Amino acid sequence: MPKETLVVSKSEELAFEYFLSFNKFSSGSSSFLGQVTKASFFSSLASSGSKSSLNSLNNEFDHLSLYEIKNSSLETEKYKTILVVCDNTDEFYGEKGLSNLTLFHNSLLPNGKFVIAIPPNSSHEQEIKKEMMYSGLIDVVSSVYYFTTFITGVRPNWKSKTDKKSPSMIDAAPIDGYISKAPDYESCSTKPRACANCTCGRAEREKLNSTDLTSDVDAPTSSCGNCYLGDAFRCESCPYKGLPAFKPGEKVILD
């Protein structure tokens, strides 16, 4: 079964100590390692088979040193929790810090928690918190538990938000439910003349054409062909007499 927690420290003993300490801190217990001091705790382990105890607890988490991580690659989206025991805060702020924190961020599962343990009252606490946010972690807070400051951050679960339908993906409502269908009208395009109740526009077109044809037939005609030149060239009975000259073929309306 794959382990859900990674502890990064110089030694397995240190990883064991901070793993238990952080579990106590997370559960809100006021005790530290079960009311047992570090010295008596590890001495009791030595007298009762500490190696087997460490091995059994190591089944709860993976352990790597920061040096091992830098010279290898962490699997992406693998751990629910990553706990880093920091003995050199220089590794976690500035360009070097952002690079290391991004590596841990990418190895967390969505909603996974990153925790870094630093000495209390560290002068670099604010810089580390800022670099954690730059790496993509959210909800970055710090808390002091006994002689350790735990700075925690969460990798956001952006995937769950993208699963929701965006407005552009919402199915459109059928338009037929909002707009009534236009009634079907009989077409007279195949008939010899327009229908009495024509709605396709044929009756209007035929009426317009008939008006143009009538005006052309009723227009006066010239017998001499010089009417357009003006009165000096028109005959006595010219219907255009008294009108100004016009261009040949130009339609002139008579009063």
Swiss-Prot record:
Region Fe-S binding site A, residue ranges: 188-200
GO BP terms, alphabetized: iron-sulfur cluster assembly
Needed cofactors: [2Fe-2S] cluster; [4Fe-4S] cluster
Any one Gene Ontology cellular component term annotated for this protein: mitochondrial intermembrane space
Residues annotated for [2Fe-2S] cluster binding in this entry: 188, 195, 198, 200
Keyword Metal-binding: yes
Region feature Fe-S binding site B, mapped onto this chain: 224-238
Residues annotated for [4Fe-4S] cluster binding in this entry: 224, 227, 235, 238
A Pfam entry, by short name: CIAPIN1
Subcellular location field: Cytoplasm; Mitochondrion intermembrane space
Keywords, sorted A to Z: 2Fe-2S, 4Fe-4S, Cytoplasm, Iron, Iron-sulfur, Metal-binding, Mitochondrion
GO molecular function annotations of the record: 2 iron, 2 sulfur cluster binding; 4 iron, 4 sulfur cluster binding; electron transfer activity; metal ion binding
Region called N-terminal SAM-like domain, residue ranges: 1-163
Renumbered ranges of motif Cx2C motif 2: 235-238
Notes concerning its domains: The C-terminal domain binds 2 Fe-S clusters but is otherwise mostly in an intrinsically disordered conformation. The N-terminal domain has structural similarity with S-adenosyl-L-methionine-dependent methyltransferases, but does not bind S-adenosyl-L-methionine. It is required for correct assembly of the 2 Fe-S clusters.
Family: Belongs to the anamorsin family.
Function: Component of the cytosolic iron-sulfur (Fe-S) protein assembly (CIA) machinery. Required for the maturation of extramitochondrial Fe-S proteins. Part of an electron transfer chain functioning in an early step of cytosolic Fe-S biogenesis, facilitating the de novo assembly of a [4Fe-4S] cluster on the cytosolic Fe-S scaffold complex. Electrons are transferred from NADPH via a FAD- and FMN-containing diflavin oxidoreductase.
Subunit structure: Monomer.
Name this polypeptide is given: Anamorsin homolog
Originating species: Theileria annulata
